[in-house]
């Protein structure tokens, strides 16, 4: 967003955004996320290779639960519907929470995933690599950075 430009956002939202943006811990966390991009891409590729058609997310969910535990989340569980969740306690005493979410399933059937390829421009190709596997890998990177930076 261009500084000083009114994009129609709620003034309270803009104020909150500016405060978050100015926090040194947030800046450090964002730098960590950028620096760890190769690791995030590796996780994205790994998760994309675990086929998870809707209603059959067990294997991908089990691996994601492991990754959340490794990242330091507490209370990592899988609910009866196959959703995986965990908690990362913040360091502030604001009483506020942040939700970071994504979904495990893809629209692809078993057998559709043959591998991950990369084109000449560096784009990854694989059924489900972006929907929503990219978000799962990115969320994990953000959670790791938050944990390391004490956010």
Per-range role (PLM):
Residues 42-43, 57, 105, 131:
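Acidic active-site catalytic centers that drive phospho-/nucleotidyl reactions
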Residues 36, 57, 135:
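Charged, low-complexity surface patches
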């Amino acid at each position: 967003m261009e500084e000083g430009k009114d994009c129609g956002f709620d003034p309270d939202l803009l104020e909150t955004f500016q405060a978050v943006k100015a926090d040194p811990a947030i800046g450090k966390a964002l730098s960590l996320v950028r620096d760890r991009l190769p690791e995030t891409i590796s996780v994205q590729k790994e998760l994309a290779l675990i086929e998870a058609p809707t209603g059959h997310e067990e294997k991908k969910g089990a691996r994601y639960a492991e990754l959340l535990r490794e990242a330091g989340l507490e209370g990592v569980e899988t609910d009866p519907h196959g959703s995986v969740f965990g908690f990362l306690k913040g360091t502030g005493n604001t009483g506020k929470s942040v939700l970071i979410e994504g979904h495990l399933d893809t629209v692809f059937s078993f057998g559709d995933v043959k591998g991950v390829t990369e084109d000449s421009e560096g784009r990854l190709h694989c059924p489900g690599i972006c929907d929503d596997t990219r978000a799962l890998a990115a969320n994990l990177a953000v959670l790791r950075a938050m944990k390391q930076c004490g956010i």
